[in-house]
């Protein structure tokens, strides 16, 4: 597939570990954690950056998905400028004076879009990753398995869509920071840390469209299976059979559902 020039430039930057603007010592690129736009399956400790334990989120399908990260601490893709500087140790894609202007260094401060052509290109590439993969857990003809079909009915009956609703299985999709509602479903613990250095009162609800691919679940990777992640919620107990069926449905939610 031929990429638009801006998207192609962004992809080049995404995979570049040698550009000193992107990382110190040539050891890290965006693709180090997000190869092919996916996730490395690891949990990172961002306590020193005002957050806490955070499992890497895939970038695929996230275009236009509203606030970013588990704590919704970014409101635009260009906010990765701060992570380039603080986490990767890069010099940054925008000039220091532009980054320090007004409240721009604050992830939720003055907009960063339109300041640096290369930063906008990087954002354009990430925004181009707008497709989820199909779930390999479905029947060969693409239909839900019997347990998953029963789990779909449970999903509706138990009100799961109150957080995981809509076309993206995420009620926060497309939300502006002012409209964002973070949810605490009982999974926040001391190791969850903070949000932008302040109290973490909830988690930005993730989409379920690629939950099957996570490898570890919840914001801190503390759940070893989808069933464990569901059981960790404090939203009501489920019997073993219902839990198994609900987990089967979530596992089969991909691009098809």
Placement of each model-derived feature along the sequence:
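Periplasmic c-type cytochrome electron-transfer domains
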Residues: 1-257
């Amino acid at each position: 597939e031929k990429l638009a020039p801006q998207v192609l430039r962004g992809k080049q930057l995404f995979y570049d570990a040698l550009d000193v603007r992107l990382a110190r010592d040539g050891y890290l690129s965006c693709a180090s954690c997000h190869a092919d736009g996916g996730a490395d399956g690891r949990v990172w400790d961002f306590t020193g950056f005002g957050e806490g334990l955070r499992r890497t989120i895939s970038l695929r399908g996230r275009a236009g998905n509203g606030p970013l990260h588990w704590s919704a601490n970014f409101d635009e893709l260009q906010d990765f400028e701060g992570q380039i500087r603080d986490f990767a140790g890069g010099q940054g894609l925008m000039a220091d004076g532009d980054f320090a202007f007004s409240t721009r260094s604050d992830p939720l401060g003055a907009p960063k879009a339109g300041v640096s052509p290369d930063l906008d290109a990087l954002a354009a590439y990430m925004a181009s990753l707008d497709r989820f993969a199909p779930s390999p857990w479905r029947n060969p003809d693409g239909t839900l398995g019997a347990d998953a079909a029963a789990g779909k009915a449970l999903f509706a009956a138990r009100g799961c869509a109150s957080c995981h609703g809509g076309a993206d299985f995420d009620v926060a999709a497309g939300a502006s920071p002012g409209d964002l509602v973070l949810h605490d479903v009982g999974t926040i613990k001391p190791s969850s840390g903070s949000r932008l250095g302040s109290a973490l009162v909830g988690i930005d609800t993730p989409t379920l469209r690629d939950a099957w691919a996570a490898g570890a679940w919840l914001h801190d990777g503390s759940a070893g299976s989808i069933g464990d992640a569901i059981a960790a919620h404090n939203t009501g107990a489920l019997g073993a059979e219902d839990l198994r069926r609900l987990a089967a449905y979530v596992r089969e939610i991909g691009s098809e559902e």
